[in-house]
């Protein structure tokens, strides 16, 4: 039930070092607005909103920004955009599969930007289902590993109904069935476990191991896609050796 996701470690470090604060906040605000629109503005009765707000607080978003995003999403305040959720499937270099989740108020712009960025990075759009068959929807709870015993977390997570616990170095990732995400998150909170985020994600069933050159191309393409205003999340099925990831981490 335990494993080690080396790319996740590099990804978390990279995000911590060079995260673009403005774009990060914009994505988090969209998450809050959508959650409030779909489930109401009370986080106590809207678990998705609770987790969106929690994630924003972890990123040090000012409380006033969060409050206004909730108000716009719930309709208590004017100004909320009418975001549409769109999922694109694509290929990066070396045949790596990508799932690109967008929240946009302009479908044509989102499609054009994603297509253009893929093309410039040596990738392409794929037909629906061509990539997603190799992914499955899961819940993920990211927990800081410092001061927390893996076996202790493993036991608590398993008792709460988690499917897996992965050691990513600086963090542990608790994997759940989509329908169990909130239950497991609440159980860990009740047990005094701090967490960074709780999200529904797409996890690859099979991964492609890349050498340095291809890993560099793929990570650059993913970074460029992530910079697009309409893109919320990107999931891929690539991995690499510790040596390759260490070199990427230094660049």
From Swiss-Prot:
It is found in: Cytoplasm. GO terms for molecular function: DNA binding. This is Probable transcriptional regulatory protein BLA_1344. Keywords: Cytoplasm, DNA-binding, Transcription, Transcription regulation. GO terms for cellular component: cytosol. Belongs to the TACO1 family. InterPro entries: Integrase-like_N, TACO1_YebC-like_2nd/3rd_dom, TACO1_YebC_N, Transcrip_reg_TACO1-like, Transcrip_reg_TACO1-like_dom3, YebC-like. Its main location: cytoplasm. The keyword Ribonucleoprotein does not apply. It comes from the Bacteria. NCBIfam families: PRK00110.1, PRK12378.1, YebC/PmpR family DNA-binding transcriptional regulator. GO terms for biological process: regulation of DNA-templated transcription. The keyword Metal-binding does not apply. HAMAP family: Transcrip_reg_TACO1. Pfam families: TACO1_YebC_N, Transcrip_reg.
